[in-house]
Amino acid sequence: MQRDTERAAQLSPSSEDEALVLRQKPLEMPAQEEDSTTLQQWKARQLQRLAEELKAEWQEARLQQVRQAERLYLSHLLDEAAERSMGNDPSVHEQNQRRTAKHTRAKERNRAAFREERGRREEHPRQHPKSRKKAPCSERRSSAKARGPASGEKGKRRRVSSSKDHDGYQGPRVTRRVGVAKLNPFFDGDTDCMEDVQKEFFREGRRPSAKGTHNLRDQSLQGKTTALTQPLLHGPTCKQEAAAQEPPSKYNKNLWHKEIESTFEELFNMNRKLKKHLNLHLEQRLKADQNPDEQQSYSEIRSETFGTPREERTEEVETAEESGSPTEVETTEMWSKVNLKQILSDSEYPRYQQIAKYPLKSESLVPVKAGTSREQDDLLSLSPESGQEPPKSPLLEDESLKPYLQKQADSVASWMALRQKQKAELEQRRQKALLELTEHPNMSLEIHYKAELEEERRARRRMRLALLKSNSTGICALPPDRNNLSLDNGLLDEDKQNQMIRDLQQQILEQNKLHQEFLEKARKRLQEFQKSF
């Protein structure tokens, strides 16, 4: 009984404990209420943040949707404009139809190859159990040779594997289209088609890279030029197809660029050489056109005195070189023509070879007049071109000496006249150059000093006539007379030139004075004008 009472006392709480519990309960109630209020506030804040984030995301999605719609609309408009612009050409329409047909065929082939390869992969582990791997090396090699598929199958396997790998990764354009489809359900069909097309492009683009670089090297330049001359494709899908179907032809491009650079360098070099020779030829022709009388006289003299001895010919050449006669023109012309022929024959291009084949006209000597005598014919027969030596007779030589000497004297006189004429032309050119340099905008020396120039020309003509008369009197002593006359003429020319230079210097000084006076007057007027304002 005592035990029962003790247990009841232990189980029943005392009055003090009950009072403590009752006091603690009202203290715990406000703490729990505060915790619940804080939780509610935190939940409300979280909900508000989520609502704001969702609103921002929704706005961004709407903006992206609008942008994608605008882009698609613009691409559609561009495609329509291109079709309208190129719709009149039936050839372009036919090409587009062919491309679409090829595209569908390639799609079907790729699908069939993928199915076959998938079936083979499923059957492969059944046909070849794992026990084969434990065979020795020789058996393993033989079995590998026996089991080895053909090169075409290997290529297909590689292709399918590459396409399968690419199925996992998609380009940025595809991801964009998928995002548009998520945002707007109207674009679902278009994006699916574009995904299929892009997968096929990846497969077709991987084919040439798997085959190796041999096919790239085998391609010719002709194929490259045709590929470059093809018309541009219209529409975004066609552009993607063209970009995917183009093989990586970096090696061939480098070769092609090198060949083009070498051909252009050769063409430029040939053009420079031809320009040089043409400039020489034109300058010589212009000189010949400026003095046709000199050429005629030179040709007549040469036809008359063609059978002279070698020493006299050398003397005439020396005198011609001193006086700048047309022989220099002929020699330079022949030299330029010979070099031009050599260059054109060395060239590798058939166009220039055809030009070189045409024979350049060789400047033949002026034919002898109809009134030539038998003695002149005999003299012409003595020329080195004839190659025949007629029988020498003393009587004929004595008879032929008199007219020959007379002709020689005439030729020397004509040579002197030509020389004087050339010197006069040179002086005129110098004077013109000096006049152009010292020309005033309102005054020209040619107008003011025309009378003086005419008087100088008349004086020169008189001097020439006097020299010709003095030369015609003495025939035997021609070489010493020629040298003396050339010295006298040189001295006279130098005196005239010095006098002309002095006159020009005086004219320049006068013009400078006039110019300074004009400048002073202009300055004074300027100062007056500035003072007035």
Curated annotation (Swiss-Prot):
Principal subcellular localisation of the protein: other
Induction: Expression is moderately up-regulated 2 days after intracranial injury and increases at 4 and 7 days post-injury.
Coiled coil ranges: 40-72, 416-531
Renumbered residue ranges of the record's region Disordered: 1-40, 84-176, 286-333, 370-399
Superkingdom per UniProt: Eukaryota
GO cellular-component term (any): motile cilium
Subcellular compartments: Cell projection, Cilium
Tissues expressed in: Expressed in mature spermatozoa (at protein level). Detected in retina, lung and kidney. In brain, highly expressed in brain-stem, cerebral cortex and thalamus with lesser expression in cerebellum and hippocampus.
Keywords: Cell projection, Cilium, Coiled coil
Signal sequence region: none
Record's compositionally biased regions (Basic and acidic residues): 107-126
PANTHER family hit by this protein: ALMS1-RELATED, CEP295 N-TERMINAL-LIKE PROTEIN
Listed name of the protein: CEP295 N-terminal-like protein
Species this protein is from: Mus musculus (Mouse)
Designated gene of the protein: Cep295nl
